[in-house]
Design a protein with these regions (language model features):
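Core catalytic lobe of class I
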Residues: 1-228
């Protein structure tokens, strides 16, 4: 079974703003993540030791799985949106708690500005190197996502990762991956080949000079693999 698959729901369920679902040791809130009170309610009074967050990238992304809310704003509106979300987030974290923010390079300035404005310390930027690129209209085809890394000041920062961790997360995966348009991508070292049905082979240049990304999800259009987190 895919470790990223969620178990099936036993019955039809409904939710409304303010609802907090208790799923074993987990809590899931139907709420506004820019509202500090709603975020505190989701945490149930607890403070986080570490945070992973995957906000909208403001790239107007859409797929068969649907669209992402708050993903097509002006630069100024998006910056304010991030400031509110990060401010609500830092309010439910312990001093010294680590934070990871997946984001898009095209909005890197806004993500970093909002990160600092909320009070976080930036320590670095990690790179998730995917096993498959995403074909688009960019000159360089995107095969990575950046992840801001830092922590909430106010207490000693603790690190448990040893001294062998690097800023590039390459989680492996098959060298063969289907693309959205029915072709196949073949990765050979740092080379990426696209193979069409007529056996035509084209080499493309990815954005990173790999855990496999989920090929599709009916629940979220840009799902992250569990191993990455």
């Amino acid at each position: 079974a895919d470790p990223d698959d969620a178990p099936p729901l036993p019955v039809a369920v409904r939710s409304a703003p303010g609802t907090v679902w208790l799923l074993g040791a987990h809590r899931v809130a139907c709420a506004d993540s820019t509202d500090p009170e709603a975020v505190r309610a989701a945490m149930g009074g607890a403070l986080a030791d570490a945070v992973w967050t995957d906000p909208p990238y403001n790239v107007a992304y859409s797929s068969k799985a649907g669209k992402i809310a708050n993903d097509d704003m002006s630069a100024s509106a998006f910056l304010e949106f991030l400031r509110k979300a990060f401010t609500a987030l830092i309010g439910v974290m312990k001093p010294g708690a680590a934070v990871y923010v997946a984001h898009a390079d095209t909005e890197g300035i806004n993500f970093r500005a909002a990160f600092r404005d909320a009070g976080f310390k930036i320590s670095g930027c990690l790179i998730w190197r995917k096993d498959a690129l995403v074909l688009g209209r960019s000159d360089y085809q995107w095969q990575h996502e950046p992840i801001l890394y830092g922590w909430k000041p106010g207490s000693a920062h603790r690190w448990y990762g040893g001294r062998k961790q690097t800023t590039i997360a390459d989680l492996g995966g098959s060298p063969f991956a289907p693309t959205a348009d029915g072709r196949w991508q073949v990765t050979i070292g740092d080379r990426v080949l696209i193979v069409a049905g007529d056996a035509k082979v084209e080499e493309v240049v990815p954005s990173v000079l790999v855990d496999a990304r989920p090929k599709r999800s009916a629940l979220h259009p840009t799902m992250k693999p569990t191993a990455l987190i």
